[in-house]
């Protein structure tokens, strides 16, 4: 929390949102291919349209006119959901170091998403391991600085057992998707 709170105070919110938009745009293949794997062809088309609009009108993805001007909503599909569609049980709840809450199915899904992520391939061929980790950590801190502080506090503060509260919130959120 102290890292993203400090980052929050130094970087203006619009800059943080623009960085998030860029990372979301560049990682579009994850959601696009998972829509295809889930036979959600309309969703795949929506993802492709968002990518084209945001890459052109949105200045390389730093802006999100697909959402703000055209109301084209991101699909947010991942390989954990794809495995669930094909009847793989969610499995055990886990908290992965540096990655946060997950289930065994979603942890396996992270590997599938990594293969579909263009940043994985850029990291593999063009960056040193420490640069790749730095890139991932920067994206994570940027995301946390935008929307997790209040959410985490609102879940854990009133809870008798914060671990169970986060577990329950995570699993309920995944079931909705």
What role is predicted for each listed range?
Residues 1-35:
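Signal peptide-directed extracytoplasmic domains
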Residues 81-177:
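A structured, mid-to-C-terminal "fold-capping" secondary-structure block
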Residues 21-104:
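Mid-length scaffold segments of soluble, non-membrane domains
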Residues 5-9, 69, 139-143:
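Short amphipathic alpha-helical segments, especially helix-boundary/capping motifs
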């Amino acid at each position: 929390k102290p890292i993203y709170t400090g980052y929050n105070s130094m970087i203006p919110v619009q800059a943080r949102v623009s960085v998030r938009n860029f990372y979301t745009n560049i990682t579009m293949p994850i959601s696009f291919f998972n829509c295809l794997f889930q036979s959600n062809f309309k969703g795949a088309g929506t993802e492709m349209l968002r990518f084209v609009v945001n890459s052109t009108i949105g200045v390389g993805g730093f802006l999100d006119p697909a959402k703000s001007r055209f109301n084209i909503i991101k699909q947010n599909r991942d390989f954990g959901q794809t495995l669930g569609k094909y009847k793989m049980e969610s499995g055990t709840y886990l908290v992965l170091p540096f990655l946060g809450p997950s289930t065994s199915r979603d942890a396996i899904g992270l590997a599938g998403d990594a293969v579909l992520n263009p940043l994985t391939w850029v990291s593999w061929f063009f960056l040193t391991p420490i640069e790749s980790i730095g890139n991932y950590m920067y994206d994570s801190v940027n995301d946390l600085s935008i929307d997790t502080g209040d959410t985490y506090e609102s879940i854990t503060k009133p809870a008798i057992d914060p671990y169970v509260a986060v577990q329950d919130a995570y699993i309920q959120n995944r079931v909705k998707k």
